[in-house]
Amino acid sequence: MEAAWTQHGKVRAREAEDVMEVEVDGLTTQAKYYKPLIHEFFRKAWRGSRPSLGSDAARAFSLRDLPRDGAGSGEFSVEIRMDYVGDPPWLDLDNLAKAILDAIKGHAFHDDAQVARLLVERREGERERIAVTVRRLTGADGGAPFHRVSEVR
């Protein structure tokens, strides 16, 4: 992906085609820290796209009225990677996933029920950060996938 990054504080993001990447520099053991940090980034700095339900008539319906099979709303794959240096931090990955999904909801997709694939991993890296990759799996018409995520390395 060669798109330019938009940055505000410790958060940066970019998008191209059906992929959005979000990175947060640094780590903390408090998962709740990430939600307001990412929300602030999207509120103050992000000028990229937002999820769309299509026509005005479609927007009038509640998300709970959308089909759960992804038809009309699209399904997504989300990969969350915690890169650390030295000893791994004591942070429950399920709490991290919930905080990140809550933070990007409304920016990458409408509702976390649209997430059909979720991968959360902790790994040693060159610098401490949280890296999130969101990919659209199905078209707005519920058709064939745009991208299939390769198997976990």
Where are these regions (language model features)?
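Acidic, proline/glycine-enriched N-terminal capping motif
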Residues: M1-R153
